[in-house]
């Protein structure tokens, strides 16, 4: 499980940073990629990665500001041109209006897609659990921005316990099909009469990962709730230390406020993105250094960076 950042800039693209988008790569878990936001130029960034557009099965939009959605028509169209690959349907989750934006863009441009898009729109009254599969659950909660905006909490369901092969060998169980039966929870009796209780050779279930991905927001309790015990918290950092007033006026957060959210939520790691173009390289180092005085395990991400979860 990895996150690859396709756009880490704020508001408009710069030479160093494209506008908002990231890919949650779940290839080992479910052979899918989930995209969060799709700012202008996202498809160009994808060309610089190993991501195959057909693997993108779901797109989650945080809000309808242009720097988070203007890349959708282009990406959706390019996804249709995957030579020799089976076309697969796509799901888009987002605030009310995202369906109208996508369909209008495709209609006006005369674009026809060989796959179906299934839209899941929500508003303030229809948040909470928005998706559940056999391996993941996704929650959405409203944040505090200048327009309706949400954050997402992706929870991987608990993983099966692992089989203790060495302990089985010591008990006289020959390697082979019996291992598979025990792994599936089946109790056995060996030829010599030894009883093998599967539960004695399988570890307890392992807790799944929690990934929190926030849209643009002021500091708010909703961010903390979404990030409780998160393995990774992706939080915007449009402004730096001392800019709390201007950040609030524009519906954004500082690096220090993001760090405070991480502390209050008990998150394990904080990844700062949505970085303003006014921050030069030396300023990026300061963003991290200042935030680390509050929450030590912090990192300022850059375009195309990949983070293992």
From Swiss-Prot:
- Which catalytic reaction applies to this protein? Endonucleolytic cleavage of RNA, removing extra 3' nucleotides from tRNA precursor, generating 3' termini of tRNAs. A 3'-hydroxy group is left at the tRNA terminus and a 5'-phosphoryl group is left at the trailer molecule
- Which Pfam families does the UniProt record give? Lactamase_B (PF00753)
Is Nuclease among this UniProt entry's keywords?
yes
Report whether GTP-binding shows up as a keyword of the record: no
Q: What is its EC number?
A: 3.1.26.11
> For this protein, what does the record note about how its cofactor is bound?
Binds 2 Zn(2+) ions.
* Cofactors, names only: Zn(2+)
Looking up InterPro entries in the UniProt record yields:
Metallo-B-lactamas (IPR001279), RibonucZ/Hydroxyglut_hydro (IPR036866), RNase_Z/BN (IPR013471)
What is the enzyme's class at the highest EC level? hydrolase
Q: Which residues bind Zn(2+) 2?
A: 67-68, 216, 274
**One GO molecular-function entry:** 3'-tRNA processing endoribonuclease activity
Chain positions recorded as Zn(2+) 1 binding sites? 63, 65, 145, 216
Q: What PANTHER family has UniProt attached to this entry?
A: ZINC PHOSPHODIESTERASE ELAC PROTEIN 1
Which family is this protein grouped under? Belongs to the RNase Z family.
Oligomeric state and interaction partners are given as:
Homodimer.
Main function: Zinc phosphodiesterase, which displays some tRNA 3'-processing endonuclease activity. Probably involved in tRNA maturation, by removing a 3'-trailer from precursor tRNA.
**Could you tell me what this protein is called?**
Ribonuclease Z
């Amino acid at each position: 499980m990895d996150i690859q950042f396709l756009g880490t800039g704020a508001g408009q693209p710069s030479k160093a940073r494209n506008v908002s988008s990231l890919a949650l790569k779940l290839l080992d878990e479910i052979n899918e990629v989930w995209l969060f936001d799709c700012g202008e130029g996202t498809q160009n960034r994808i060309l610089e990665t190993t991501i195959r557009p057909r693997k993108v099965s779901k797109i989650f939009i945080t809000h309808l500001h242009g720097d988070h959605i203007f890349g959708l028509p282009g990406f959706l169209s390019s996804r249709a041109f995957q030579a020799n690959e089976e076309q697969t349907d796509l799901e888009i989750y987002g605030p009310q209006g995202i369906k109208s934006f996508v369909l209008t863009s495709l209609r006006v441009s005369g674009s026809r897609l060989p796959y179906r898009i299934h839209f899941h729109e929500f508003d303030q009254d229809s948040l909470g659990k928005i998706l559940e599969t056999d391996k993941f659950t996704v929650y959405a909660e409203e944040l505090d921005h200048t327009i309706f905006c949400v954050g997402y909490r992706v929870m991987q369901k608990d993983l099966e316990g692992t089989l203790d092969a060495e302990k089985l060998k010591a008990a006289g169980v020959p390697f082979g099909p019996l291992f598979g039966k025990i792994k599936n929870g089946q109790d056995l009796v060996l030829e010599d009469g030894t009883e093998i209780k599967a539960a004695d050779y399988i570890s307890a279930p392992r807790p799944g990962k929690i990934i929190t991905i926030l849209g643009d927001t002021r500091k708010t309790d909703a961010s903390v709730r979404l990030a409780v015990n998160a393995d990774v918290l992706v939080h915007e950092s449009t402004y730096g230390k001392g800019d709390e007033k201007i950040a609030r006026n524009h519906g954004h957060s500082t690096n220090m406020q993001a760090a405070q959210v991480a502390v209050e939520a008990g998150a394990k790691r904080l990844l700062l993105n949505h970085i303003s173009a006014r921050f030069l390289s030396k300023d990026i180092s300061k963003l991290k250094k200042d935030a680390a005085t509050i929450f030590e395990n912090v990192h300022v991400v850059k375009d195309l960076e990949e983070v293992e979860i």
